[in-house]
Amino acid sequence: MSKLITTEPLKSMAEVISNYVIQRESFSARNILNKNSLVKKEIRYDLEVPTSADSIWSVYSCPDIPRLLRDVLLPGVFQKLDVIEGNGGVGTVLDIVFPPGAVPRSYKEKFVNINHEKRLKEVIMIEGGYLDMGCTFYMDRIHIFEKTPNSCVIESSIIYEVKEEYAGKMAKLITTEPLESMAEVISGYVLKKRLQVFGFEIKPKLRFNLLLCLIICLVIAGGMFVAGVPL
């Protein structure tokens, strides 16, 4: 029996287990290496606007903003900007195509966060675009900060992760320029709407003079009324 009973089965089991552990450790090491080979970047553009935070946020958070950008604020910029899923709220997916020569030419993006309390909107790229050029993650973040009751700051950020070997190339391609354009046209749109009286645009420099004239007219009219002078 001593010749029949050996430790070979236990040796085989030990070898199988040790090989399994080694493979798991090797797999974990590769995962750590892959994670370490990703570069995370964040770039930002701030624009101060002389109007309330709520008025600016009302445009950024508007469910109709895809149509507004395509047809009103940035006409001619997009070859296509279609809502293919959702109604303008969280979960909405846009299919965006730019004219030939643009980089990137096309991509799909998704609204993943619209926080009215914080005035925060986050949109991630889910297909095409920079994801086909070395990025593993790309997000636009818009945060509207109130500065005073009549002024605010539009904080436009881009957060992305890219494979280390593509980091230099993508740093040259990814800029805040698209978000800058959006912030400028939206703020201009809000200011123009706010400064209209009876359909006529009132330039910012004339606001104080207009208000002063209105006050003087009211004072004169009030004085004439008190004095019994017919108006």
Swiss-Prot record:
Coiled-coil features, chain-numbered ranges: none
UniProt GO cellular component terms: endoplasmic reticulum membrane; nucleus; vacuolar membrane
List of residues binding dopamine: 107-109
Record's note on what induces expression: Up-regulated by elicitor treatment.
Tissues showing expression: Expressed in roots, stems and leaves. Detected in flower buds and germinating seeds. Low expression in carpels. Restricted to sieve elements of the phloem adjacent or proximal to laticifers.
pH dependence: Optimum pH is between 6.5 and 7.0.
Biological pathway: Alkaloid biosynthesis; (S)-reticuline biosynthesis
Residues annotated as the enzyme's active site: 121
Catalysed reactions, as listed in the record: (4-hydroxyphenyl)acetaldehyde + dopamine = (S)-norcoclaurine + H2O
UniProt-listed Enzyme Commission number(s): 3.5.99.14
Keywords: Alkaloid metabolism, Endoplasmic reticulum, Hydrolase, Membrane, Signal, Transmembrane, Transmembrane helix, Vacuole
Residues holding (4-hydroxyphenyl)acetaldehyde: 140
Membrane topology value: Single-pass membrane protein
Main location: endoplasmic reticulum
A Pfam cross-reference name: Bet_v_1
Compartment list: Endoplasmic reticulum membrane; Vacuole membrane
Membrane spanning stretches: 210-230
Gene Ontology MF: a single term: (S)-norcoclaurine synthase activity
Xref: Gene3D superfamilies: 3.30.530.20
Function summary: Involved in the biosynthesis of (S)-coclaurine, the common precursor of all benzylisoquinoline alkaloids such as morphine, sanguinarine, codeine or papaverine. Condenses dopamine and 4-hydroxyphenylacetaldehyde.
Other comments on record: The 40 amino acid N-terminal extension should included a signal peptide targeting the mature protein to the endoplasmic reticulum.
Protein name listed in UniProt: S-norcoclaurine synthase 2
Name of the coding gene: NCS2
